[in-house]
Amino acid sequence: MQIALLLLIAYLLGAIPTGLIVGKLFFNKDIRKFGSGNLGATNTFRVLGKKAGIFVTIFDVAKGVLPAIFPIIYDLDIHGIWFGLAAIIGHVYPIYLNFKGGKAVATSAGVILGVNPVVFLIIAVIFFTLLFTTRMVSLTSILTSIGNFITTLFFDDIILQIISFLIMLLIIIRHSSNIKRIISGTEPKIQFKK
């Protein structure tokens, strides 16, 4: 019963639309109507600016970290990745918004941080290296999700490997429109200020 309740809490936590809330509360903007229309951190950066983007990124990562460490908090004999997966599903399919959510990149990163900080550090290096190289958040996110799965293969954790594979597939599917733009050469690139 406790595990079922915590899975539900993890889902509801993951479903909190951080970007939408920040946009409406502080900027009187529905970010779904601007930029890419996505609820995630990348579109928040584009539409609402750096400070809002950083806040949303941190909060979305936290939405993954907290459920992932539920087994530590509540002394449960279950892998934290299951609660993390519930949070990811909540972020992608939020009940509060008719199940139309974000792409789960930041929340997935938070889940990995919660269950295996070493893997997180490795994929963080991969992410920022690719970001500065390609300047495309979408391509970076896709390749990092693949890198995350490959990285988990070097750890003795079959559950983490399986869920990381599913997360990779989910992130690729959620970026299908981005993939089309990458192929056509029309995907936006971010500009780094000197």
UniProtKB/Swiss-Prot annotation:
Pathway(s) of this molecule: Lipid metabolism; phospholipid metabolism
UniProt membrane topology term: Multi-pass membrane protein
This protein's UniProt keywords: Cell membrane, Lipid biosynthesis, Lipid metabolism, Membrane, Phospholipid biosynthesis, Phospholipid metabolism, Transferase, Transmembrane, Transmembrane helix
Disulfide bonds: none
Pfam families, alphabetized: G3P_acyltransf
Transmembrane segments: 3-23, 47-67, 78-97, 112-132, 153-173
Top EC category: transferase
Subcellular location field: Cell membrane
InterPro entries, A to Z: G3P_acylTferase_PlsY
GO cellular component: plasma membrane
UniProt catalytic activity: an acyl phosphate + sn-glycerol 3-phosphate = a 1-acyl-sn-glycero-3-phosphate + phosphate
Entry's EC annotation: 2.3.1.275
UniProt GO molecular function: acyl-phosphate glycerol-3-phosphate acyltransferase activity
Gene Ontology terms: biological process: phospholipid biosynthetic process
PANTHER family named in the record: GLYCEROL-3-PHOSPHATE ACYLTRANSFERASE-RELATED, INNER MEMBRANE PROTEIN YGIH
Record text on subunit structure and interactions: Probably interacts with PlsX.
Functional note: Catalyzes the transfer of an acyl group from acyl-phosphate (acyl-PO(4)) to glycerol-3-phosphate (G3P) to form lysophosphatidic acid (LPA). This enzyme utilizes acyl-phosphate as fatty acyl donor, but not acyl-CoA or acyl-ACP.
Family: Belongs to the PlsY family.
Protein name listed in UniProt: Glycerol-3-phosphate acyltransferase
Naturally occurring in which organism (per UniProt): Macrococcus caseolyticus (strain JCSC5402) (Macrococcoides caseolyticum)
